[in-house]
């Protein structure tokens, strides 16, 4: 039981006899509070999916001219960034399907709450670090090429790197929520 600073009455105290106002929060209010991190994580993963898809499309279509210096596949750093965007897209897709199933049916596809919390946290961490690794490999190449010339190829590469960064932000914020959920599972 916890006490309110304004009064000495506990929050979980039963309602007074004959009173229609309960002293504790209702079950619906508690359910809404417990579901807020789940909905926030679902929204963040949807953003990660969108930004990963856009980064993948922009990078994969960054072919200006007939090969040579203006083709993303010429640069291993861009291929690495593209690969990390693909991994993030696949991970976000799997997690979105899993979260949607969890919200609709009330059951998780991963057996055990603690195992599911570990999968969420570890997966978010690995994918977030992979994304930041991919975009940090591609950013210096784009910066170096922009010093020589500023063209559509460099602008498209910079846009893809920025979108990968936004996907990283969404997944890393999702990792914070997953870490919070994992800490609750470790306590319970």
Swiss-Prot record:
<feature type="transmembrane region" description="Helical">
    <location>
        <begin position="157"/>
        <end position="177"/>
    </location>
</feature>
<feature type="topological domain" description="Cytoplasmic">
    <location>
        <begin position="98"/>
        <end position="114"/>
    </location>
</feature>
<keyword id="KW-0472">Membrane</keyword>
<comment type="similarity">
    <text>Belongs to the Casparian strip membrane proteins (CASP) family.</text>
</comment>
<comment type="subunit">
    <text>Homodimer and heterodimers.</text>
</comment>
<feature type="topological domain" description="Extracellular">
    <location>
        <begin position="136"/>
        <end position="156"/>
    </location>
</feature>
<keyword id="KW-0812">Transmembrane</keyword>
<feature type="transmembrane region" description="Helical">
    <location>
        <begin position="115"/>
        <end position="135"/>
    </location>
</feature>
<dbReference type="Pfam" id="PF04535">
    <property type="entry name" value="CASP_dom"/>
</dbReference>
<feature type="topological domain" description="Extracellular">
    <location>
        <begin position="64"/>
        <end position="76"/>
    </location>
</feature>
<feature type="glycosylation site" description="N-linked (GlcNAc...) asparagine">
    <location>
        <position position="154"/>
    </location>
</feature>
<feature type="transmembrane region" description="Helical">
    <location>
        <begin position="43"/>
        <end position="63"/>
    </location>
</feature>
<keyword id="KW-1003">Cell membrane</keyword>
<dbReference type="InterPro" id="IPR006702">
    <property type="entry name" value="CASP_dom"/>
</dbReference>
<keyword id="KW-0325">Glycoprotein</keyword>
<protein>
    <recommendedName>
        <fullName>CASP-like protein 4B3</fullName>
    </recommendedName>
</protein>
<keyword id="KW-1133">Transmembrane helix</keyword>
<feature type="topological domain" description="Cytoplasmic">
    <location>
        <begin position="178"/>
        <end position="188"/>
    </location>
</feature>
<feature type="transmembrane region" description="Helical">
    <location>
        <begin position="77"/>
        <end position="97"/>
    </location>
</feature>
<feature type="region of interest" description="Disordered">
    <location>
        <begin position="1"/>
        <end position="21"/>
    </location>
</feature>
<feature type="topological domain" description="Cytoplasmic">
    <location>
        <begin position="1"/>
        <end position="42"/>
    </location>
</feature>
<dbReference type="GO" id="GO:0005886">
    <property type="term" value="C:plasma membrane"/>
</dbReference>
């Amino acid at each position: 039981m916890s006490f309110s600073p304004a009064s000495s009455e506990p929050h979980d105290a039963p309602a007074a006899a004959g009173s229609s106002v309960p002293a504790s929060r209702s079950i619906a209010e508690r359910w809404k509070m417990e579901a807020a991190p789940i909905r926030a994580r679902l929204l963040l993963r949807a953003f990660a999916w969108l930004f990963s898809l856009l980064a993948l499309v922009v990078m994969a279509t960054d072919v200006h001219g007939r090969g040579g210096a203006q083709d993303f596949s010429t640069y291993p750093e861009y291929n690495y960034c593209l690969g990390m965007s693909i991994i993030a897209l696949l991970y976000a897709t799997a997690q979105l399907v899993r979260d949607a199933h969890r919200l609709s049916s009330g059951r998780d596809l991963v057996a055990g709450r603690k195992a599911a919390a570990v999968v969420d946290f570890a997966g978010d961490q690995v994918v977030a670090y992979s994304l930041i690794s991919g975009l940090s490999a591609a950013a210096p190449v784009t910066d170096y090429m922009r010093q020589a010339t500023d063209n559509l190829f460099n602008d498209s590469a910079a846009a893809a790197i920025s979108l990968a960064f936004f996907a990283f932000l969404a997944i890393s914020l999702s990792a914070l929520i997953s870490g919070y959920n994992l800490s609750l599972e470790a306590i319970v």
